[in-house]
Amino acid sequence: KQVSEIIKICYDNDQEVIIHGGLTNLVGSTKSHSNQVVLSLEKMNNIIEVDEISKTITCESGVILEDLINASKDKELLLPLNFGARGSAQIGGAVSTNAGGLRVFKYGMTRNLVMGIEAVLPDGTIISSLKKLMKDNSGYDLKQFFIGSEGTLGVVTKLVLRLYPLPKTRYTSLAVTNDYQKVLDLSLIHI
């Protein structure tokens, strides 16, 4: 609600807003100027629920990715989103950039993990599709507009993410070949 109030005040006063997450993105999209309001989401760091039945985790957008990974692991579940900046990157930023990560070939991009979103539109309106449903054909899939939008359409404030059973075993392999296509073929066989 506070994000909504701040965004509405800025909208009413034609004030530019830059959203800050973990500041791990290196493309300069969070660079701010003296005439802009910087809205940090770092205190929106609550994990609301890890649901073992629906295999989902519901959280605020400022939660550090590694905290989500660990909370899932405590319930013997896997949040497959995992990349180098996991100890400081916030989940809202990962969603806003549609981050890939180390397990993208098996589990897909962040887009494939997001089941529901709550977001604040530029005029301060809160929209919510915080659903845990795997199959939902109840109209437009609003969350898809926000995933990868880099905050241009609104501020993501809460999320429902899909989890997987924690793998019982882990295999590592090394393949050396002169042909990149052979590497791809091998990796797809074992994923």
Region roles according to the model:
Residues 1-44, 59, 79:
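Glycine-rich N-terminal segment of FAD-binding domains in flavoprotein oxidoreductases
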Residues 21-24, 64, 190-191:
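Ser/Thr-glycine-rich phosphate-binding loops at phosphate-binding pockets of nucleotides
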Residues 46-50, 56-189:
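FAD-binding subdomain of flavoenzyme oxidoreductases
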Residues 9, 189-190:
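A generic secondary-structure signal
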